[in-house]
UniProtKB/Swiss-Prot annotation:
Job description of the protein: 3'-exoribonuclease that has a preference for poly(A) tails of mRNAs, thereby efficiently degrading poly(A) tails. Exonucleolytic degradation of the poly(A) tail is often the first step in the decay of eukaryotic mRNAs. Essential for early development, possibly by participating in silencing certain maternal mRNAs translationally. May have a pivotal role in stress response.
GO CC term (a single one): nucleus
Organism: Arabidopsis thaliana
Pfam families from the UniProt entry: CAF1
Protein name, UniProt field: Poly(A)-specific ribonuclease PARN
Amino acid sequence: MRRHKRWPLRSLVCSFSSSAAETVTTSTAASATAAFPLKHVTRSNFETTLNDLRSLVKAADFVAIDLEMTGVTSAPWRDSLEFDRYDVRYLKVKDSAEKFAVVQFGVCPFRWDSRTQSFVSYPHNFFVFPRQELTFDPPAHEFLCQTTSMDFLAKYQFDFNTCIHEGISYLSRREEEEASKRLKMLHGEDGIDSSGETEELKLVRLADVLFAARMEKLLNEWRSGLLHGGNASSEFPRISNGSNQSMETVFHHMRPALSLKGFTSHQLRVLNSVLRKHFGDLVYIHSNDKSSSSRDIVVYTDSDSDKENLMKEAKDERKRLAERKIQSAIGFRQVIDLLASEKKLIVGHNCFLDIAHVYSKFVGPLPSTAEKFVASINSHFPYIVDTKILLNVNPMLHQRMKKSSTSLSSAFSSLCPQIEFSSRSSDSFLQQRVNIDVEIDNVRCSNWNAGGKHEAGYDAFMTGCIFAQACNHLGFDFKQHSQLDDFAQNEKLEKYINRLYLSWTRGDIIDLRTGHSNADNWRVSKFKYENIVLIWNFPRKLKARGIKECICKAFGSASVTSVYHVDDSAVFVLFKNSELVWDFLALKRQLESSDGPVSVLHPLSKILEGGNTGAADYEAYKEICSSHVSEVMFSDQAETVGVKSRTRPNAQCETETREENTVTVTHKASDLIDAFLANRVEVETATSN
């Protein structure tokens, strides 16, 4: 079972001490009943956990992370496709990170314990939820939920109630900056006049006039009582029959004041207008008491200097309150700030999407290009290693993983069976295994049942275990502590650090230090993107094979290398060369503008049937993918974005002037039509004879 309704904080088979955790050997029977120790963190225990996590991260040799999200793709065509260029892959990752929410964040520091000759791991499972914490926030956060992802989470018993009700909220750095600016604008520089008005309020309604006169009379009586030692009673009677409004004498920072209760915001504005007009030594303040409860008061000041001091005190109080509100709203981002400030090696598994989510949720809006993203993320997290790349690139580990996939669970089972099943392996590859213990709240365990896969905290633990085992096979000698002093700078890891897959399924490997990308899939590297035409909104009865046949009849049997479906409404056509791309686009346009029989008889007529078929070069595909909109069908997406058919490459994409070539392309289109007609006449003549 993946999760219990009540999470065990301690395992009965684990012993502990108040000063240091001790690992003890337990019986096989006892260990068989031990649940995996995992620190679950919600709003209720976040602050105390964060304080403990600071010391754990500071002492860690590396930190493994993993995220659980509400979805991956906002439309079927936004999945990672075979013909996606590296910049398009980034745009699809960007779209995913911007539209879906993170609901769990796993953080697992790993520290080498020379005394026990083992790694000690500290798995934390944070529930996060983008709750609106600040009253002056923009409209509440919105995010998509992909049905397959939600079903996947439910299958593994994800606790949605805990996530929504107890999940830790957060502000990104950009949101924090904007919140600070909004607070300053909202409260003004003096921080006193809560109404924010600088002009005198004009009283039009009779009720306002009567209320102002009544307030002037009551305030004058109270002020006279203070000045002349008269009857400044501690509590005034109710303002009117049936009203809950009351005024009571209190003290505000050693100054006599009136506490106002039950007044509406409009009435307070009217009262404030009365004070400014008739009472120079009375000041209205909206403040907070020690319990952070707001209150409205009118304060008496005995001099101009005292009034200035009161205004300064109110301003400072509001500033402190604003800082507390924002600091509280930052929430889980403090964990991200901790990881960034400590500059530890961050370990993930197939983690480019995870890193994009980290940036989008906790730093700011994702940059428009992969190059800009790489430059920015590297300044926050200079050392990142992807265990999936480590397993695929290293020859020895790759040979090992040929027996199974490189998914997280498969890699964990293959490389760390002694950890997953708490048993010894006869596999010679694993004879020199790395021992890993788990410690939660000073309780250390070395035996447990397998935890809940696809729970972020446990997945982060598995990721760290895979990395530790891989390092062992790379030749790390953990007994020599000097090799761990600067884990990220170790030469054995140099070729793997800061190299991530630029997608969640397949694609290029991008170097976070340089921004350069190299295709790791031979099929991607075998063609040129300038040879691709994107066709959409053709008749649904046509499939890839039929489209290829139509084009080959018009341009020759060897003109098209392959046709690949984006979805049912669009295809990529890979031509033999780029000249054929522009020949096709020019011919399409000429056929569409013709009303003669050629447009009906031509082989391309099957593709153009209906008059709504669109076609453009690969740059149009990039433009469509860059849109924030996500229609289900690609043809609808192209129409929504407003991409039109193109017969010539964009000026910014040209590498040389094509003015003469454009004329040539047009002539070629005419030649193709003439050739088609001539061929048809010959065929008909031969048939008639």
